[in-house]
């Protein structure tokens, strides 16, 4: 039997964009009340449409959500799930046409795609292809792997193209897998990586798309859950030995119907 590939198959779904903004409160407060009201109404209508997403019964959710950031790293976070990069770019351009946009200063962004790593399935698929006498890397091998992943793709559509959870709080952070001299995630056998990945969350992949390898979005109605979850992750091998974490961004959901409360400083 030929040596099986150590690269697991992956499935990709929604393209995801995080936009982090500072808000120019000084300029905003100088506006007359009627102008602020009009700008707020315009943005609320846009956000409501984005929140609703795709209303077609067989379409992907393709939703957006707004969050009020806690701390000095920014004021607002917009997250968008869309089918393509072009759709994400249209969202950016649509926001830029609003009367609110001059008051927004984008300080950061993060681009990724929902990714499911098929660690366990990959081993089975590779073994089945090898039993058929196929050689890794050949057109026949690639076609067989493609057919197998296509079947899995259909069964995992709701995870690949998720709706944004209705939870009140969001914790977002990027992360890498270490490649140092002492530990290197990518040199571990695929079977070992599969075992360790059973302890991880479903994350978005950003290799070749942004500065980190993955982005993680956690949603909860109790922010202490984030602390407990990340604390527990420090004890699983994937995170404790192989993970390198970026900045953490914690924020509170702002629905379109409540956007006036945010502008007025009365968000509950």
Task: Describe each region flagged by the PLM.
Residues 1-52, 83-87, 112-192, 221, ...:
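Short S/T/G/P-rich N-terminal loop/turn motif that feeds into the first structured element of a domain
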Residues 5, 47-74, 101-116, 192-215, ...:
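Short, glycine- and small/hydrophobic-rich beta-strand elements in well-ordered beta-sheets
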Residues 19, 69-84, 170-175, 210-233:
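Short, well-ordered beta-strand segments in beta-rich or mixed alpha/beta enzyme
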Residues 76, 89-91, 120:
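A short acidic (Asp/Glu
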Residues 84-87, 98-101, 195:
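Secondary-structure boundary elements
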Residues 90-97, 228-234:
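Short amphipathic alpha-helices in soluble, non-transmembrane regions
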